[in-house]
Design a protein with these regions (language model features):
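Bacterial N-terminal signal peptides that target proteins for export
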Residues: 1-9
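Subset-of-secretome marker
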Residues: 22-135
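Compositionally biased, disordered extreme N-termini, encompassing classical targeting presequences
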Residues: 3, 19-22
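Bacterial N-terminal signal peptides
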Residues: 8-17
């Protein structure tokens, strides 16, 4: 169970930041629904909802929006049109490797991310939409 907890902590570090920032993303309040699959887990993890308010500065530099964790570095980043792909490696207390892809569709996006940490693989799917201006 300890490994599963560490994996969950790693995931929490990168939501919502892991999937943001492409040319078509606008500032404002975004709502994300995340589903996760962990092979070998006895029960499916329920989807989680979160929201985040992104300023104009937040969405200006796509690479910087992937993570704010000082122990993580983006090792590969590509953006073409409305699609962003990346790879990231984290060290320190919660080491892991991530790869992801996000496709933006106006004021929404679909994202997939794969994380490898402590011998486990976690697949995540994120659906997000802009719900308005920041409060």
């Amino acid at each position: 169970m300890k490994k599963s907890s560490a994996v969950a902590v790693l995931i929490a570090l990168f939501l919502p930041a892991a999937c943001f920032g492409a040319g078509s993303m606008r500032d404002g309040l975004w709502e994300m629904t995340t589903t996760m699959e962990m092979p070998g887990m006895p029960m499916a993890m329920p989807p989680t909802k979160s929201s985040h308010c992104f300023s104009k500065e937040d969405v200006k530099d796509q690479k910087k929006t992937i993570t704010t964790d000082k122990d993580c570095a983006v090792t590969e980043f590509k953006q073409s049109g409305n699609k962003m792909t990346y790879k990231m490696k984290c060290t320190g207390q919660n080491p892991g490797e991530f790869s992801g892809e996000t496709v933006f569709k106006g004021d929404s996006y679909d994202s997939t991310m794969k994380m490898k940490a402590e011998g486990q693989v976690v697949n995540m799917k994120i659906k997000a939409k802009r719900v308005g201006n920041c409060p």
